[in-house]
Amino acid sequence: MEFLGTTQTASYCGPKKCCGLTSLPAVQAPVIQECYQPYYLPGYRYLNSWRPSLFYKIANVQTCPDESTSTLRPPTILPTLRSALFSRYSPHDWDQSNQLQVRGAEASRLWASRLTDDSMRLLQDKDQLTHQMQEGTCRNLGQRLSDIGFWKSELSYELDRLLTENQNLETVKRRLECAANEVNCPLQVALECLYHREKRIGIDLVHDNVEKNLIREVDLLKCCQEQMRKLAQRIDIQMRDNRDAQHVLERDLEDKSSAQCIDEKCFNLRNTSDCISFFHGMEKIDGTISVPETWAKFSNDNIKHSQNMRANSIQLREEAEHLFETLSDQMWRQFTDTNLAFNARISEVTDVKNKLQTQLAKTLQEIFQAENTIMLLERSIMAKEGPLKVAQTRLECRTRRPNMELCRDIPQLKLVNEVFTIDDTLQTLKLRLRETQDTLQLLVMTKCRLEHELAIKANTLCIDKEKCMGMRKTFPCTPRLVGHT
């Protein structure tokens, strides 16, 4: 009779089953990595934190090949022994199991000891690596602070020089504006001189050397004024460029000051500092926009740009100083030439006036002489009328002689000759009287012309000597012409 299954006691009676127990898999040594790896921080839960940390896999349950086939037909054993012999093992199985447990324990202890040693070495290596990296970071931060301090000093030095140059340029611009305004006074004087000289009369309204110099002076003053104003405009544009460069330097200096404060704070951080904390994922964020080369080049370019602006400013200041020197010399030379032309013209007009006055005096003397001559001629003519009347009366009386007494005797001839002579004398005197009267009229006209010319010359002298030269007694001094007040 056969029964399905066997009891625990009867299992000893059945044939021995070969149950091969597989050994534990070999455990691999951990791999030590020198690079930074993400790690789990205490107090945080992750998705795989619930899984057990096992160093080996549990061996799958091995089944005997005979058991798989015997399930269809259980062995034939006694019913009374099946329950007692079902869970029994052989001594060999027991020894093998104990040896297996001992070997497993020894393997676990060996692995634990090896892992402990490796962990201690790992701790030492990582501690040393962390300390070295922290020291290296501190050195790098210190070097960075030195670099920032160097560029800050360079930027501050350049900024101070640029500010000084801006002040100097502002002073030159103010001098140019003052000098341009100072030119208005001599320009107005020159224009007033031209306007006054337009009031000359007659022939004295001549385009003389004085007028040429005045026109040249007006043109020169306007040209100088225009040059100074144009240079002031160029300086104003350069000052705007300088202010732009100044703002760039100030912004760069401010950024470097902020970066220096931040890096000093980072440099002074220690493991025991109170303000340190975890900031997860910051190492994955790259918000930088420059590298050390471009960072240094940026400040260097700003300094070079500022130096170029200062060079342009220095060139403009030198140009302004040269312009001051040249224009002031030209204005003074032209002012002197115009005054010399005025003096020469005044001397010339004075000489002509003196000559005219001399001629007028002589003319007046001649008029007086002519008037006296006319008076004498008139008296002489009147004096000759008596003898002529006597002679003519005698001839008329002798014409009344009778007959033969009408003789052409010597008295008759003398009387006739006397009448002709006196008559000829009267005609001559009358002719001379008319000539003298014409001469007197000419002298009077000459006197009028001379007096008119003297009035013209007096008006010219009044304009040139009193009005024009009265205004031209003063001229802006050289310091005022170069913008110094």
Curated annotation (Swiss-Prot):
Q: Which family does it belong to?
A: Belongs to the tektin family.
Q: What is the lineage of its organism?
A: Eukaryota, Metazoa, Chordata, Craniata, Vertebrata
Coiled-coil positions are 114-185, 225-247, 307-385, 421-444
| GO cellular component, as recorded | axonemal A tubule inner sheath; microtubule cytoskeleton; nucleus; sperm flagellum
- Protein name, as recorded: Tektin-5
- Provide this UniProt record's keywords sorted from A to Z: Cell projection, Cilium, Coiled coil, Cytoplasm, Cytoskeleton, Flagellum, Ubl conjugation
Give a yes or no for keyword Coiled coil in this entry: yes
Described by its record, this protein's role is as follows: Sperm-specific microtubule inner protein (MIP) part of the dynein-decorated doublet microtubules (DMTs) in flagellar axoneme. Forms an extensive interaction network in different conformations that reinforces the helix bundle composed by other tektin proteins (TEKT1 to TEKT4) and MIPs to anchor the tektin bundle onto the tubulin wall of A-tubule of the sperm flagellum.
Source organism per entry reads Homo sapiens
Work out whether the entry's keyword set contains Electron transport. Answer: no
Maturation and modification: Ubiquitinated, leading to its degradation. Deubiquitinated by USP16, promoting its stability.
- Enumerate the subcellular locations listed in this protein's record, separating them with semicolons: Cytoplasm, Cytoskeleton, Flagellum axoneme
| Gene Ontology biological-process annotations | cilium assembly; cilium movement involved in cell motility; flagellated sperm motility
What InterPro entries does the record tag this protein with? Tektin-like, Tektins
Q: What is its main location?
A: cytoplasm
Summarize subunit and interaction data from the UniProt record for this chain.
Microtubule inner protein component of sperm flagellar doublet microtubules. Interacts with TEKT3.
